[in-house]
Amino acid sequence: MEIQPRLATESIAGQRPYQEDAVLAQALSDGRIVVAVADGMGGHAAGDVASALAMETLVQALEDGQALGDAFTLANSRVHSKSREPGKQGMGSTMVAAVIDGATFTVANVGDSRCYLLGADGIKQISEDHSFVAEAMKRGQSEEEALSSRFKDVLTRSIGIDEQVKVDTFGPYPVENNTALFLCSDGLYKVMTNARIRELFGRSGGPRGAAQSMVATAYEDGSDDNISIALAEFGEVKRDRAMDTMPIEFVPPPADDTADDAADDGADDDVPIVAAAPAAVEADDDTWNEDWDSSTAVTSRGGQNTMLIVVGVGVIGVVLTLLFLMAA
């Protein structure tokens, strides 16, 4: 017997001056259901375009009968083509999606937005992160070591950065009663452990209450990124009814619009206000250390300023050396 899921989404700009995430949870014309999260990068007038275009293409491709992985491939192609336009260079997006087809579901992802399966027995991450941290941990580094690296915000795959991208797909898996598919951007899970995500979900009333409460908590816990959730709950995941410990609805203060206003004053809206991310490449085992060449990977939202600082320090060092030699 098919279990009809209850759907919910929640997304806020948080402490960022603009929103680059996109979320959806909707039924397709053939009765299948798609839930997805995309986290754009590229700055004002670029990151939001990338995530929105990736989502739009995903839905169109699924409506046309394409498989989930093929829909991601088409999304990558369209975003990459769009990135050739003035002011859009270097834009890209992560994307994670689940398609529920009757009694089964399938998951696909590119980047580090995540899909979890929540149930009475805990939480399991279905998707795999395409990031420096994830790759470093696969090669034996501890999570603490990987997160202390200056490359901790670097992505190894992204929608739209390269002409082609490898898409990871998972499933199909059977839909089980009293479980939930929980998709989120890194703005949420970077301030919460997996256990914390399951705990907070269990304290919230229904999918809508869970989405609102968890976005609110991530914001209050200091997330400095856009925060987004899309979920589908089958039946009802076991919950702790101590509702007084969690807010049911939270509206954060509006983001500071000064960055947008400054960009609008006599400037071309198509010009991004952050540097474009370099292209991604496959790395061998020797690259995952502190000598790793960051110029060969996609840089996620928080990492671009760090890379610019590294380059700037190097240039300053060269200039000072030349001046010293001339004086001598």
Which sequence ranges carry the predicted segments?
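PP2C/PPM-type serine/threonine phosphatase catalytic domain
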Residues: 1-328
